[in-house]
Structure formats: structure tokens, C-alpha cells
């Protein structure tokens, strides 16, 4: 898309929001409590602050203030106030390609924010535990939140991801013509690296005329040992392994499709 010469500030709002899920099986009540404590510590307010501070760097935002909070019995959120750095619009990369990978939180850039909240969860029966992180990156001006997508998915090591991207409002060029989007996009998937896309089954539901884009991701490879907490698959009977695998896979599909699935 040809770069626009605008009249005044770019008034478009670009919002990227997604849910990231991590699934685990904990055999006993003690193991379930241990998993919740482990995941709560792994994604505490300090670590989330580090992740979102790097996110601000990736999208080109300048941090003004940070507020963070860990909750009892579990969960965390962080808030970062930021401003848009003095960037030459000619240097902003608006092309449709993946952002960088790494080697809650709210941020405010002029009229923009980044936020993340965590939700560890388990049920006393069945042994299934889930961890959900809700993240939203909303920006005004030339900054694109899509550049942080690759980094955030990689950092949070997700089994399931649901992503929404929307462009709202309009901006005017020097001739007074309204523009309701200032960059090309056919799919959120085009902002992910090839190695990232190879790991997931993905489906898009897009409403192009409304500048609304939606992508769902489900991890392709399933290895039971990666989903067990303090229990080795080889210590279980074949029947137990099959039952746990079926329960985990059902849980993941229900979250991915957003509906309860009857047992076969």
C-alpha cells in the first residue's frame, strides 16, 4: 500500500487481542495445587513486566510508568503507561510480514494501551488444569501492534491461541479523503514466522469490509510427557495413558472450538 500523506495525527486505532492457553494434567490434588503455584510464579507480575516492556520496544513505544500487581490466591496483571516515540513515518515498516522472535500489563501510548491478565484454573475432579493469559495491544498513530504478535506467542509457549485484530476509526489525507485502514492485511497469519505457523493448525474468520480479522491456533504435535505435571507417562498403565490423552485432547478441542464436545 502506498504511504499516505496525512492531515494531522493518524487517528486510526489498531487493536490486537488474544487469549493464550496452556493445558496440563495433574494426577492428584497436591499436584494440581503444585501446578497452579508453579504457573502462577512463572508468569508473575515481574516476568509479565519484562515481557511487555520488550513488547513496547518491539512496537516502538516509550515507557512512561509501570504498575503491577500479583493477586491472591493466584493471577497477575501489569500496567505500563507509554508514549509514541518521535518516529519518522517514512521509517515505519507497514508491510505484511512476521514480527521478531525473542533470543498483565497495560500500556498507554498517547491514546493507546497494552494489557495482560493471567488466569490459572483447575477442577477438583479429572486432573485437568489450564492457564489463560489475556493480552490486548491497542495503538493509535503509526505503531502497529501486529509486530509484537510473534514475540508474545513464543514467550508464552501456548497450546491454543485465539487472536482478534481490528482497525477502528478513520484518518484523513491532505486532500480530506477519509482512510479506514492504512496498511495491507489479508490474514493475521501473515505476521507469523514460518516456523511458528508450522507448529499449529490454524483457521481464519475475517470480515474484510469491517477491518476485523480473527485467527484460531491449535498445537499440532501432542506428546503426553509435555502435559504431565510431576508424573511420567511410563509410570502409568496403557489404559491410564489412553484415558489421560483422550481427556487432554478433548479439553484442547473444546477450548479451540469454543463449545463443549460430547464424549464419544
Swiss-Prot record:
Its EC number is 4.1.1.50. GO terms for molecular function: adenosylmethionine decarboxylase activity. One of its GO terms (cellular component) is cytosol. Its cofactor is pyruvate. InterPro entries: AdoMetDC_fam_prok, S-AdoMet_deCO2ase_bac, S-AdoMet_deCO2ase_core. Coiled coil: none annotated. Pathway: Amine and polyamine biosynthesis; S-adenosylmethioninamine biosynthesis; S-adenosylmethioninamine from S-adenosyl-L-methionine: step 1/1. It holds the Pfam family AdoMet_dc. It comes from the Bacteria. GO terms for biological process: spermidine biosynthetic process. The record marks 111-112 as: Cleavage (non-hydrolytic). It is an enzyme of class 4 (lyase). Is synthesized initially as an inactive proenzyme. Formation of the active enzyme involves a self-maturation process in which the active site pyruvoyl group is generated from an internal serine residue via an autocatalytic post-translational modification. Two non-identical subunits are generated from the proenzyme in this reaction, and the pyruvate is formed at the N-terminus of the alpha chain, which is derived from the carboxyl end of the proenzyme. Binds 1 pyruvoyl group covalently per subunit. Keywords: Autocatalytic cleavage, Decarboxylase, Lyase, Polyamine biosynthesis, Pyruvate, S-adenosyl-L-methionine, Schiff base, Spermidine biosynthesis, Zymogen. The keyword Lyase applies. PANTHER family: S-ADENOSYLMETHIONINE DECARBOXYLASE PROENZYME. Belongs to the prokaryotic AdoMetDC family. Type 2 subfamily. Heterooctamer of four alpha and four beta chains arranged as a tetramer of alpha/beta heterodimers. Catalyzes the decarboxylation of S-adenosylmethionine to S-adenosylmethioninamine (dcAdoMet), the propylamine donor required for the synthesis of the polyamines spermine and spermidine from the diamine putrescine. HAMAP family: AdoMetDC_2. This is S-adenosylmethionine decarboxylase proenzyme. It comes from Salmonella typhimurium (strain LT2 / SGSC1412 / ATCC 700720).
Amino acid at each position: 500500500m502506498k504511504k499516505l500523506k496525512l492531515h494531522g495525527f493518524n487517528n486510526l486505532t489498531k487493536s490486537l487481542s488474544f487469549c493464550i492457553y496452556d493445558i496440563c494434567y495433574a494426577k492428584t490434588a497436591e499436584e494440581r495445587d503444585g501446578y497452579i503455584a508453579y504457573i502462577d510464579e512463572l508468569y508473575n507480575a515481574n516476568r509479565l513486566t519484562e515481557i511487555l516492556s520488550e513488547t513496547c520496544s518491539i512496537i516502538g513505544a516509550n515507557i512512561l510508568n509501570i504498575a503491577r500487581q500479583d493477586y491472591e490466591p493466584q493471577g497477575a496483571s501489569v500496567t505500563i503507561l507509554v508514549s509514541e516515540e518521535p518516529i519518522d513515518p517514512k521509517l515505519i515498516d507497514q508491510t505484511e510480514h512476521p514480527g521478531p522472535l525473542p533470543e498483565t500489563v497495560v500500556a498507554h501510548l498517547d491514546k493507546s494501551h497494552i494489557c495482560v491478565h493471567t488466569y490459572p484454573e483447575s477442577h477438583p475432579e479429572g486432573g485437568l488444569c489450564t492457564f489463560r493469559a489475556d493480552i490486548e495491544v491497542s495503538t493509535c498513530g503509526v505503531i502497529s501492534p501486529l509486530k509484537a504478535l510473534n514475540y508474545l506467542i513464543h514467550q508464552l509457549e501456548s497450546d491454543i491461541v485465539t487472536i482478534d485484530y481490528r482497525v477502528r476509526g478513520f484518518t484523513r489525507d491532505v486532500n480530506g479523503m477519509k482512510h479506514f485502514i492504512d496498511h495491507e492485511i489479508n490474514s493475521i497469519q501473515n505476521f507469523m514466522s514460518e516456523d511458528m505457523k508450522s507448529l499449529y493448525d490454524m483457521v481464519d474468520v475475517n470480515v474484510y469490509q469491517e477491518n476485523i480479522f480473527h485467527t484460531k491456533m491449535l498445537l499440532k504435535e501432542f506428546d503426553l510427557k509435555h502435559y504431565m505435571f510431576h508424573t511420567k507417562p511410563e509410570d502409568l498403565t496403557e489404559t491410564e495413558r489412553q484415558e489421560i490423552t483422550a481427556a487432554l485432547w478433548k479439553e484442547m478441542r473444546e477450548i479451540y472450538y469454543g463449545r463443549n464436545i460430547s464424549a464419544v
